[in-house]
Each structure stands twice: as structure tokens, then as C-alpha cells.
Amino acid sequence: MSPQTETKAGVGFKAGVKEYKLTYYTPEYETKDTDILAAFRVTPQPGVPPEERGAAVAAESSTGTWTTVWTDGLTSLDRYKGRCYHIEPVPGEEDQFIAYVAYPLDLFEEGSVTNMFTSIVGNVFGFKALRALRLEDLRIPVAYVKTFQGPPHGIQVERDKLNKYGRPLLGCTIKPKLGLSAKNYGRAVYECLRGGLDFTKDDENVNSQPFMRWRDRFLFCAEAIYKSQAETGEIKGHYLNATAGTCEEMIKRAVFARELGVPIVMHDYLTGGFTANTSLSHYCRDNGLLLHIHRAMHAVIDRQKNHGMHFRVLAKALRMSGGDHIHSGTVVGKLEGERDITLGFVDLLRDDYIEKDRSRGIYFTQDWVSLPGVLPVASRGIHVWHMPALTEIFGDDSVLQFGGGTLGHPWGNAPGAVANRVALEACVKARNEGRDLASEGGEIIREACKWSP
């Protein structure tokens, strides 16, 4: 039975429940170079046609609501509406399909990841006509990319600042993550940097707690950096976590880091928020600080296979919002990561131009034009025996971040750092000599053990 409608006197206006596909499903539409394109994995409620559900996603994430409203006549829906322009099945999943949606660029505020996500994913994921919804990928048009500053410095500028070339960078997260005093924390930082690491790191939940206030930590870490630099002749850094309860406090911590003369600060970009992250990124570029990004909370958003957002979308958003490093998974180690899929979004972080490649999860060709690249950080559950695989998989433009793989060395922190550095240099040397790291990795590490703790 058709829904009841009410006619407004004199204007011929009809209210009532409308099928979304009548307005928002447009398979004949040819996408524009300026459109933001989205690929959604849709799991509809039983009995609902794919065209209607795909159109509903386009409508509820752009101009639509459940009925026609009289103010529709005061604007041009054809100019501003999102369009579901293509639907394809998901192989092996009878109840799922991919809906491709095109959004006009005028729907989004320039230079605002916050506004982009508020529009595309802010409301539609709670739509009861859908059992589940996942944003698999976005195509960001060049016209929109150019409204963002992006990373504060990028890969090449970071290497020039550090004067380190031809190999991955080495890092270590200080453990235990919580409970150390600032002085003992600084001691661990010094031992790791003195042993040969390029960076050490605050854990994501180290902010300013009663056992270690942020200012004390910054001071002792700066002392460790300068002492290790003087003794090794290398430029060193520690990711000082500036994440705070307010943007004002976050910037205050970054200002203090700059006054100490340290090279890099850190931010938890998902828990801190994109507005805060973009603000910090702008400050870092203006003041010569590198910015390390941790993705704490990402698995809440990206781990479910049929609901939420894939990490490649969060990675693209970070490149737009700004960060010089971001944690990206390891493929090896204790956290999840499929090799081809992980390398797909690693390339989206580093490269200027990435072709569509569905085998790697890349739904759209992405052109970043002149936006600087981001170094992927491989971390969590890795140690020296993973070094050949990590060197082969991630290449030179990466940060290999060890925690227990450094601090868990039976001889102490400094020998653990020495072991990491010796293993890395052995793998890079073997690779440059043409040896196969995949098949000879164990032998390469055993040879290196003769010259390392």
C-alpha cells in the first residue's frame, strides 16, 4: 500500500516516505575530476534491493532525509546531492555489495578533515535499514587535496634534518609504558639512543599523569637526547607526546618542546581529534618540528570487516591533516596486517601517485600532487629476527619501532639497541649486495651476531 501523502494548498507539494533510488541512484552518472568518490561495503536488511540501499547511503551522507521537504525547492539538489553511481557484488558474500558514491566538492569545507568525515560518515552508519556499513576507500580529488597543508615536512625534509639516508630509521617505545619516574624514563631514553637508535618514543597513553608530569619528562628526555648526540655524533630524537585534554594545552607542550630544541613531538590523532591534529601539524611546520602520529583507537574503527572504516581511509585522512610518521602495522609481529593490503596503504602514505589496484585494496587511483609523504612506522611485537622481513617489506622509507625487542635484551637497554642497529645495518648491506633477505635472513642475522651483543 502506498504511503499517505498530504498536499500543500496552492503549491502542489507532496510529503511522505519516498524511495531514495528515485533521486539518488544514478547509474548513468559520469564522475567528475572534482568529485570525492567513496566505496562503501553495504550489508542491508533482508529484502531491501541493493539500488535502494546504495541510494540511501548517498542520500543520508549528503542532502537527503526520509521525505521531501519544502525547502528542497530553494536549492538545486542536482548540484549538491550525493549519487550512488555503481553497485557491484562482494565475491563470496551473498548479502553484501560495494556501493560507489560521488559527492560534489561544494559539500565540503576546504582544508577540513573534520568536516569531510562529519559529512560522509557522521550519520549514515546508524541507519537502521542497514545491518552494517563499512567505508572501504575514498578518492580525494586534486582540487580538494590542494586545500590541505598535509605533513609538516615530509620524508625528504626529515632525512635532510636528521642527515640519515639509505636505510630505515630505528626507534624504540620506552617500557613499561606507565609508572616510571621522569628521571628513570630519561635514563632509558639515553641508553637506547646511545646504543644506536635514531628515536625513542612515548607510549600513546603517556601524557601528564601523577607519576610523571609532562614538563619533567620533556626535560629529562631532552637531556638524554643532547648527551647521546654528543657521544655518538648523530642526530637523535624522542617522540614527546603533546596530546592533551585541550588544544591550548597541546600547543603549550609543543611550544616547550621547541624551546628545548628537540626535533620531534607526537600526537594521538584519533583520540585527540582531527581538528587538534591539523592545528598541531600547522604549528610544527611553522616551527621546524617533526610530527610523529600514533593511531590509538584505530581498531575500534577499522577492525570489523563489515562495519566501520578501513585503515587506508584513516591513513589518507592523516596525510591530509598532517603527520610525518604514522603507525601502519607490521605484517609480521603481534598485530594484524595482511601483506598486500598493508603495503597498499603504505604506498598511499609515501607515494605521489597510486594506481587503482583491487588486489591491494585500492579502489581508486589517487593523485597527491605535491603533498609531502608520510613515513610508515612498523611496530608492536617485533625483534631482531624480524629485521630481514621488515627491511624487505617496508624498504628504506620507514621507521622500524621496537619496544620489548630492544628493552627485553638480557644484557640491558643499550645492548638491545646495539643489536637492533647491527641487525639493520647487516640486512641493508646484504640487500645492497644482492642477497635474498627472504631466504637468507636467518643466516645474515647469525653472521651479524658475531659482532653484536
UniProtKB/Swiss-Prot annotation:
Signal peptide start-end: none
Sites where the protein binds Mg(2+): 201, 203-204
EC number in record: 4.1.1.39
Record text on cofactor binding: Binds 1 Mg(2+) ion per subunit.
An annotated Gene Ontology molecular function: monooxygenase activity
Catalytic residues (positions): 175 (proton acceptor), 294 (proton acceptor)
Oligomeric form and interacting partners: Heterohexadecamer of 8 large chains and 8 small chains; disulfide-linked. The disulfide link is formed within the large subunit homodimers.
Protein name: Ribulose bisphosphate carboxylase large chain
